[in-house]
Swiss-Prot record:
Name of the protein this chain belongs to: Large ribosomal subunit protein uL10z
Function according to Swiss-Prot or TrEMBL: Ribosomal protein P0 is the functional equivalent of E.coli protein L10.
GO annotations of cellular component type: cytosolic ribosome; Golgi apparatus; ribonucleoprotein complex
Family statement: Belongs to the universal ribosomal protein uL10 family.
Quaternary data: P0 forms a pentameric complex by interaction with dimers of P1 and P2.
Domain of life: Eukaryota
Post-translational modification: Phosphorylated.
GO MF, one annotated term: structural constituent of ribosome
Upper classification of the organism: Eukaryota, Viridiplantae, Streptophyta, Embryophyta, Tracheophyta
UniProt KW keywords: Phosphoprotein, Ribonucleoprotein, Ribosomal protein
GO biological-process terms attached to the record: ribosome biogenesis
Amino acid sequence: MAVKATKAEKKIVYDSKLCQLLNEYSQILVVAADNVGSTQLQNIRKGLRGDSVVLMGKNTMMKRSVRIHADKTGNQAFLSLLPLLQGNVGLIFTKGDLKEVSEEVAKYKVGAPARVGLVAPIDVVVQPGNTGLDPSQTSFFQVLNIPTKINKGTVEIITPVELIKKGDKVGSSEAALLAKLGIRPFSYGLVVESVYDNGSVFNPEVLNLTEDDLVEKFAAGVSMITALSLAISYPTVAAAPHMFLNAYKNVLAVALATEYSFPQAENVKEFLKDPTKFAVAVAAPVSGESGGAVVAVAVEEEAAEESDGDMGFDLFG
């Protein structure tokens, strides 16, 4: 007859196992395991077999093992797991892609009936339609104030009814009605609550971000930094081009309003004095091969326009 291990021996074995996993893995999913049965957990372990290990245990034991590992190795990074070990949770150690592992875990959710006293994880809404129940069952609907009518010898629900709100406890009447309707409103499985990756802890929603999402958020951040920098006149890499452009505009405005000048301002002053030069300058680059001809045509057209103007004609009229 095998000798049963004592509690102290079990703790030593558990500490050894968890410390070994912490040595081998740098990625961990912290998962909630409420209402998850042993058979369901076994199926999840089989599904993740290969590059992932599921470890369950009491929070106190897990915290104890993490502290022991930190003391032995001097690696304090895993201590960030301690605040996450609250409630009925487990750890999934993995070397695979975190998003793929998270999606694999989600596949093993199973439907569950609404049991009396259970706290509803979601809103439960009963949709309108024929229930298939005979008229003698109407008392269940009347107790819950669900509008019904008799249609072809069966009870039919007329309008959608919010039977249970998220966070409320399931009552006996609600549980009985859902059972009669064959509705299993809840689904349970391991739910990823937090992600640990090489010392960083973050929300599992981050796993769903795509490269486009990251680029969009980065661009929005740069835009905000640029706007703030310009508003308070604080130089940053993002705002520098705009600051140089604004400074140039300000200096140019001063040069135009005063006798002060500089090479770039001289060009602008020349354009303002004789706009026809600006027209010629714009027309010139249109054709690289016949640039001279374009300039000549532009000048001739200007002269013709002035001549036609005296005769009451408009070249563009």
